[in-house]
């Protein structure tokens, strides 16, 4: 690894989790929830060092007395004051670096509004005094991490899912499709269907418990109807989960009904296409000559693609949509939860990339709009 003094920082700000670390490392050093919590009640304890806000894991552990807010919604930053708190926490508390000493690579959602990239650039240079920075598109980094430069990435995180076709390293913007259906919606849906079983989860703190149930017990059925029949006929698919207070709850068909919403958004009352159709539609928006390469390089990325069974189901669904002669390959790397970050780590440590950074000097000369000229 290059000397830590000037190692570039790679920060992948997701809607649910923030992943941060040093370029050249093979995994992020810090992974923490993208949340800012504020006390719900007036402090009564003496010597508690009353803070007006908590970030990340600390907010998570004190969630019972806080109101939790996510500054990134659907992949796009909506609350800049809270976002600054998260970046501050990333640099000073998690990585323990002085941001003015390291170039920083940030990631952004595909089709991020132009004003957002400018604001990110401005905050890095003016608030944190970064010597250099760059903004990269998340899905492109995931593809790099899989060792490819051509393919289609289905990137599904906590707040948003995208299908991004990439040819020779360039995202094809006209064919990028966005689906506002991701991990957070599945957590909400699981809360709802658990209520049907008579379990009640309502507060922001309880939602985090349901998220944990989802991550530990849910899976994608290869054949939904058949799985429902199996679940109805026997208890073989039931699992139990112990809540923090010791109460044990049992969950059965909810285990696969929850992620099924990715393939059938009508479960959530949404009219959009499922993830399999979205991938297919995205491919069909591309030039006919490159479609074959996209079908053969379909890469899954992000935490919401971590369900067991998702790759097999994708293979089955896309095979049903595509021409019969075509070879379809779904690539689901085991580290796909972090592949955006890993791709950023690879990119920022390439010798050929060093000329791509936006320097403080360029920013001072051109202002925030420089980001559109240098990052594409």
Curated annotation (Swiss-Prot):
Residue ranges annotated as propeptide in the record: 1-2
Protein location: Cytoplasm, Cytoskeleton
SUPFAM superfamilies from the UniProt entry: Actin-like ATPase domain
Coiled-coil ranges per UniProt: none
Gene3D superfamilies: 3.30.420.40, Actin, Chain A, domain 4
A Pfam family the protein falls into: Actin
EC number(s) per entry: 3.6.4.-
Modified residues annotated as N-acetylaspartate in this record: 3
Principal subcellular localisation of the protein: cytoplasm
An example molecular function term from Gene Ontology annotations: ATP binding
Modified how: Oxidation of Met-45 to form methionine sulfoxide promotes actin filament depolymerization. Methionine sulfoxide is produced stereospecifically, but it is not known whether the (S)-S-oxide or the (R)-S-oxide is produced.
InterPro entries recorded: Actin, Actin/actin-like_CS, Actin_CS, ATPase_NBD
Superkingdom field: Eukaryota
Positions carrying Methionine sulfoxide: 45, 48
Sorted UniProt keywords: Acetylation, ATP-binding, Cytoplasm, Cytoskeleton, Hydrolase, Nucleotide-binding, Oxidation
GO cellular component: cytoplasm; cytoskeleton
CDD domains: ASKHA_NBD_actin
Record field: catalytic activity: ATP + H2O = ADP + phosphate + H(+)
Summary of the function given for this chain in its UniProt record: Actins are highly conserved proteins that are involved in various types of cell motility and are ubiquitously expressed in all eukaryotic cells.
Family: Belongs to the actin family.
Protein name: Actin-1
Organism: Aedes aegypti
